[in-house]
């Protein structure tokens, strides 16, 4: 496997300094959306880099390759799969890791939860190390973060907090972000950061950086937020 170009970051401390207090933009259009095309993903990536985003989270090997050729900022690469016999969706296979590395990812993120999976999380973490990319653990609990740190995973994220149970919360998990930070982890806040105020609170809670997705790049989702609010207001007005 060829050496990975990490967008000029020689070590994790350099990347941490670069991302400190910054916004990472996740560009993952709604599946089947008119925007769910590589050309549009590349266009959004260029636009948010020009607006000041310091890193991107991109799904899919082909998308990562296309975006990597178009931007200068680091990419957190993932592959999402819907498996028939496992709840693991984010980068479940070593082959996914290899594909993302060759496509130009600086960081490769994976599901670090302790659930039934096709390949062990230890094997995935080691595979990322073998590529020369930095690893990011998408966690749901503090225990996931402890495990990731014990494996030498460089970045821990609150990505999956609230997404592995039956009831999905509506607000971010600031407590988990704070716990990761207080443990000394390179912490990425992610999950339900839908306003600038929430993103700022994540930094105040100890996150190095905040990943924002739906609020910036999923037009259908944001339109629904506005529609729900205006329609509810209209119903209240009519009730009076």
Swiss-Prot record:
Source organism, top-level taxon: Bacteria
Pathway stated in the Swiss-Prot or TrEMBL entry: Amino-sugar metabolism; N-acetylneuraminate degradation; D-fructose 6-phosphate from N-acetylneuraminate: step 3/5
Natural source organism: Vibrio cholerae serotype O1 (strain ATCC 39315 / El Tor Inaba N16961)
GO terms, molecular function: N-acylglucosamine-6-phosphate 2-epimerase activity
Gene3D superfamilies given in the database record: Aldolase class I
Top-tier EC class: isomerase
Pfam families referenced in this protein's UniProt entry, alphabetically: NanE
Purpose of the protein: Converts N-acetylmannosamine-6-phosphate (ManNAc-6-P) to N-acetylglucosamine-6-phosphate (GlcNAc-6-P).
GO biological process: carbohydrate metabolic process; N-acetylmannosamine catabolic process; N-acetylneuraminate catabolic process
Upper lineage: Bacteria, Pseudomonadati, Pseudomonadota, Gammaproteobacteria, Vibrionales
EC numbers on record: 5.1.3.9
Reactions accelerated catalytically: an N-acyl-D-glucosamine 6-phosphate = an N-acyl-D-mannosamine 6-phosphate
Alphabetic keyword roster: Carbohydrate metabolism, Isomerase
Record's protein name: Putative N-acetylmannosamine-6-phosphate 2-epimerase
Xref: InterPro entries: Aldolase_TIM, NanE, RibuloseP-bd_barrel
PANTHER family: N-ACETYLMANNOSAMINE-6-PHOSPHATE 2-EPIMERASE-RELATED
Gene behind this protein: nanE
Family: Belongs to the NanE family.
Keyword Nucleotidyltransferase annotated: no
GO cellular component terms listed in the entry, alphabetical order: cytosol
């Amino acid at each position: 496997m060829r050496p990975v170009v990490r967008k000029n970051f020689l070590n994790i401390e350099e990347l941490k300094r670069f991302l400190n207090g910054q916004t990472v933009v996740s560009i993952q259009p709604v599946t089947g959306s008119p925007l769910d095309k590589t050309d549009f993903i590349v266009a959004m990536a260029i636009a948010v880099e020009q607006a000041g985003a310091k890193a991107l989270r991109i799904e899919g090997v082909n998308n990562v390759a296309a975006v990597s050729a178009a931007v200068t900022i680091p990419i957190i690469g993932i592959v999402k799969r819907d498996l028939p016999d496992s709840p693991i969706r984010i980068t479940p296979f070593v082959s996914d890791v290899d594909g993302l590395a060759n496509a130009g990812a600086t960081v490769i993120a994976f599901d670090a939860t302790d659930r039934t999976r096709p390949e062990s999380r230890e094997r995935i973490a080691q595979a990322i190390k073998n590529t020369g990319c930095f690893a990011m653990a998408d966690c749901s609990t503090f225990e996931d973060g402890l495990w990731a740190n014990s494996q030498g995973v460089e970045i821990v994220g609150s990505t999956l907090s609230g997404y592995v149970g039956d009831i999905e919360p509506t607000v971010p998990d600031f407590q988990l972000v704070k716990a990761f930070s207080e443990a000394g982890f390179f912490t990425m806040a992610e999950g339900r950061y839908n306003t600038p105020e929430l993103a700022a609170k994540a930094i105040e809670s100890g996150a190095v950086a905040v990943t924002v997705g739906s609020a910036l790049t999923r037009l259908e989702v944001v339109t629904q937020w506005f529609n729900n609010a205006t329609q509810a207001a209209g119903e209240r007005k009519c009730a009076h």
